[in-house]
């Protein structure tokens, strides 16, 4: 299959194909325009993959433009995090990073042009009155008493706004369209508002800032964007997008196309609510591994390729739908099953003493780094008289369905020997502290010579060589599929979204690279935590289990 044949197809790509075939466009120019008021989440990844992917596949260009028109909510921290996320996902923007604030002078000039044409006016209604005058879906709005000011009055008042002559909230610039429009967005929308706040790019040069709907279309036009792609909630805004461009003297007129946003179950996609989780310390930060942010998913152990694959699988349509969390988890599970090296870790250890081995015994057994990829090589793992196994892998009594270690029965230690549990030792609380076993010396990576069948295989770590480690077992942050629908979304937090255990890993993991994925055999996929893990104190995050075991 050629690269072109392997491309995902969707209604947007079909439009682009038609535009190129008809000669409407001879090249493709897209953009990704996030507001730097928070970290990007998995929903933004869909837009990133769409916009940058189209530019890549059609040998076009994609700009990274920050929609930085609200200095009160924005921060350079978010700018830097967004750039990191886009690059980590595997994409490169065309030329320099762009900012809507780069165009503040042009935007101001276009606002003056609209005033000069009698298509914009300075309104002195309060924000509350503007909302009241706007009307509802079933009732038309009514005109502001300031709507019929002369062009000269409006030019003078807008200049007064520009010079700081009005207090915040006492004046704004509005488009003069139609207060009876069936589309509320067209009922004299606000174009400029006053904010006395330093801007992370322009400092204190401006005290008036353009609104999104005014800024977005003009920025697209100034950059020569051919296909302006946004999510469905901006569908009605397309009328204002076109109105602004139709009424100013700008040669380029991009077309806006809308696609469905990503709604992921057991997650929140609102940046306002995600910020609330951070501010109220429900999570440790924007990159908490339970967050649906790109940085959170990365820290948890998700690969960029798995997120890109997820975006391919869910596709691009005009129909809003909810995507199961299992679909995202399936992508990382498939990726890591194929590519993650194997290692052994015991998350809830109990000691096993092999009594028919001499004290101080040490040998090394060969273990493949991947059972299906010999090219990934193998490693030598220490085996000794004392090993740790997982507490869940032993029972004093069990039925035939239990294929692990049982008192008086045998099990195989993976890639090592068959052992038999002979006796146990407990503490005063009745907790098993030690399991005493014997081993069959003739069973190193082979069946017993007498033909007896040993069906169970468990993982282990040599006690003498084990490295202590902390394991952070992450699960879904919310206990219901649609937390946004709850009266108080915080009431749906999953109390078991993080469990921390102490155990051991094999010695090869002492130098584990941060965020490098491993399959801990029989446990799941893990990576060393970027924040907390060090050679002196290993901390591993569980990315996802070996299989989907969630019961909502």
From Swiss-Prot:
Its EC number is 6.1.1.18. InterPro entries: aa-tRNA-synth_I_CS, Gln-tRNA-synth, Gln/Glu-tRNA_Ligase, Gln_tRNA_ligase_bac, Glu/Gln-tRNA-synth, Glu/Gln-tRNA-synth_Ib_cat-dom, Glu/Gln-tRNA-synth_Ib_codon-bd, Glu_tRNA_lig_a-bdl. ATP binds at residues 35-37, 41-47, 231, 261-262, 269-271. Belongs to the class-I aminoacyl-tRNA synthetase family. It is found in: Cytoplasm. GO terms for cellular component: cytosol. HAMAP family: Gln_tRNA_synth. GO terms for molecular function: ATP binding; glutamine-tRNA ligase activity. This is Glutamine--tRNA ligase. It holds the Pfam family tRNA-synt_1c_C. A motif ('HIGH' region) lies at residues 34-44. A motif ('KMSKS' region) lies at residues 268-272. Keywords: Aminoacyl-tRNA synthetase, ATP-binding, Cytoplasm, Ligase, Nucleotide-binding, Protein biosynthesis. L-glutamine binds at residues 67, 212. It is an enzyme of class 6 (ligase). It catalyses: tRNA(Gln) + L-glutamine + ATP = L-glutaminyl-tRNA(Gln) + AMP + diphosphate. One of its GO terms (biological process) is glutamyl-tRNA aminoacylation. Its main location: cytoplasm. Monomer.
């Amino acid at each position: 299959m050629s690269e072109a044949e392997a491309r995902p197809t969707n209604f947007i790509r079909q439009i682009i194909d038609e535009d190129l075939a008809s000669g409407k466009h001879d090249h493709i120019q897209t953009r990704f325009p996030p507001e730097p008021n928070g970290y990007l989440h998995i929903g933004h990844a869909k837009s990133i993959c769409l916009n940058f992917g189209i530019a890549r596949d059609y040998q076009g260009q994609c700009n990274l433009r920050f929609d930085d028109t609200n200095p009160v909510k924005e921060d350079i921290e978010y700018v830097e995090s967004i750039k990191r996320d886009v690059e980590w996902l595997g994409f490169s923007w065309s030329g320099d990073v762009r900012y809507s604030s780069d165009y503040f002078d042009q935007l101001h000039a276009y606002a003056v042009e609209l005033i000069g044409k009698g298509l914009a006016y300075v309104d002195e209604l309060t924000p509350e009155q503007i909302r009241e005058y706007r009307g509802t879906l079933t009732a038309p709005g009514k005109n502001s008493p300031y709507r019929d000011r002369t062009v000269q009055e409006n030019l003078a008042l807008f200049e007064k706004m520009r010079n700081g002559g009005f207090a915040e909230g006492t004046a704004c610039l509005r488009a003069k369209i139609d207060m009876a429009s069936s589309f509320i967005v067209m009922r004299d929308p606000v174009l400029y508002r006053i904010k006395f706040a330093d801007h992370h790019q322009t400092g204190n040069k401006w005290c008036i800032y353009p609104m999104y709907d005014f800024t977005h279309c003009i920025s697209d036009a100034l950059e020569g964007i051919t296909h302006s792609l946004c999510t469905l909630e901006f569908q009605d805004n397309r009328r204002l997008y076109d109105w602004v461009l139709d009424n100013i003297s700008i040669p380029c007129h991009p077309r806006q196309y809308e696609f469905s946003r990503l709604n992921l179950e057991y997650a929140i996609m609102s940046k306002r609510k995600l910020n609330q989780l951070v501010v109220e310390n429900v999570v440790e930060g924007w990159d908490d591994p339970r967050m649906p942010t790109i940085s959170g998913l990365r820290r948890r152990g998700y690969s960029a390729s798995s997120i890109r694959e997820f975006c391919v699988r869910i596709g691009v349509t005009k129909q809003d739908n909810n995507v199961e969390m299992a679909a995202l988890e399936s992508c990382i599970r498939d990726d890591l099953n194929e590519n993650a090296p194997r290692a052994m870790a015991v998350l809830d250890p109990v000691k096993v003493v092999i009594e028919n081995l001499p004290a101080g015994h040490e040998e090394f057994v060969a273990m493949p780094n991947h059972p299906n990829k010999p090219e990934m090589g193998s490693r030598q793992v220490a085996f000794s008289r004392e090993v740790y196994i997982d507490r869940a892998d032993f029972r004093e009594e069990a039925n035939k369905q239990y294929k692990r270690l049982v008192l008086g029965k045998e099990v195989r230690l993976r890639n090592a020997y068959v052992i038999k549990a002979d006796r146990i030792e407990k503490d005063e609380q009745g907790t098993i502290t030690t399991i005493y076993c014997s081993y069959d010396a003739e069973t190193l990576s082979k069946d017993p010579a007498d033909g007896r069948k040993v069906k169970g295989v468990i993982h282990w770590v040599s006690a003498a060589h084990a490295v202590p480690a902390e394991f952070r077992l992450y699960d879904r942050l919310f206990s219901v599929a649609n937390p946004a629908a709850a009266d108080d979304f915080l009431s749906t937090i999953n109390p078991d979204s993080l469990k921390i255990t102490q155990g051991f890993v094999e010695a090869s993991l002492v130098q584990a690279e941060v965020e490098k994925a491993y399959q801990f055999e029989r446990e799941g996929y893990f990576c060393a935590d970027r924040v907390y893990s060090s050679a002196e104190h290993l901390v591993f995050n569980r990315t996802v289990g070996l299989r989907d075991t969630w019961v909502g």
